[in-house]
Amino acid sequence: MKIGKFEIRLNSQLVLLCLIVIIWLCFGIVNPNILSISNTYSILSSALVPLMLALPQMLIVAMGGTDMSFTVISAISSYITLRIWDVNGAAEIPTIIIILGAIAIGIVCYLINWFLVDRVKISTFIATLGVNSMLKGFVLAFVSSSYVNSLPSGLKAFSTSALATAVNSEGVEYVLHISIIFVILLYILLYFMMEKTMFGRKIYSIGADEDAARRAGINVSRVRLFAFILAGILCGLTGVLHDSLSRFSMPLPPDVVGKELNSIAAVVIGIGGSKKASGIVAGTFLGVILLQLVSSNLVMLGVPSYWQQFVSGIIILIGLAFQAIQVVKKAKR
């Protein structure tokens, strides 16, 4: 039985990977420059923040919920930390302090989510939607609406760190940012946590059937607490990465806040038509890459934004349909 489940998960991800390759080649037929190394670097670099943003959502979805606060928490965790540094006029501060400050704020925000979900018994979607709105008002009313234009030197240096560079046919240089290593390592660690540890299995069990998990002796409240804390840590890291790459910080950046559905779509594509979330980490990675591939290349082809949204929606439906068919076929065997 375990082997059968593994095969379903593998085929689901394999179909998604094949879909990415097919779409990439189709774009390449229309415009051969899309297949270039420089464009690949551009897509991967633009996918860094979406890849990080999808991780806290992935954890909540694995437990059977939907998080609507992760984008705001990611944005304000870094902004508040940098704003405090900026207001105090500190000449310099170690990057690790900024990271730890952002992580601490992310954890506090998710502890609020946990309290509302676990103690007050509000659904995850409603609770996080309320926290989303509350935090937006809080940061603008009590912190600031001003930009932080000058970042600590450590973040400035990190923002210009390149793993590789490539020049396109027009002489424009594209950079593959070094943080791609960190993002990939983080996905690998979370993959092993979710698939190979007891904690990951407990998360899957809660997502499949919370009451059954409780009857099986799983401390649902404790597992949810640690999962929410981990989501807060991921949001803090995401916020710092975003601000470093942007080279400034603002309270509610439009390329983060309001992008909840993009991350939800990536996670949904990742788990495919399966009723269970197993294999969600690898699936989420591929889901983000698929959406970023479509979005970036449509921009390169000069397609209007409303058509980009339409095509992205079609791609999501096709990806889910293929994966659902694979699951049904396996279930009949």
Regions found by a protein language model. Name each.
Residues 1-21, 25, 208-222, 294-333:
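Cytosolic-side transmembrane-helix boundaries in multi-pass membrane proteins
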Residues 32-42, 140, 146, 194, ...:
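Inter-helical junctions in multi-pass inner-membrane proteins, predominant
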Residues 120, 124-196, 226, 246-253, ...:
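Transmembrane helix-bundle core of multi-pass membrane transporters
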Residues 124-126, 175-181, 224, 255-260, ...:
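Loop-to-transmembrane alpha-helix initiation sites
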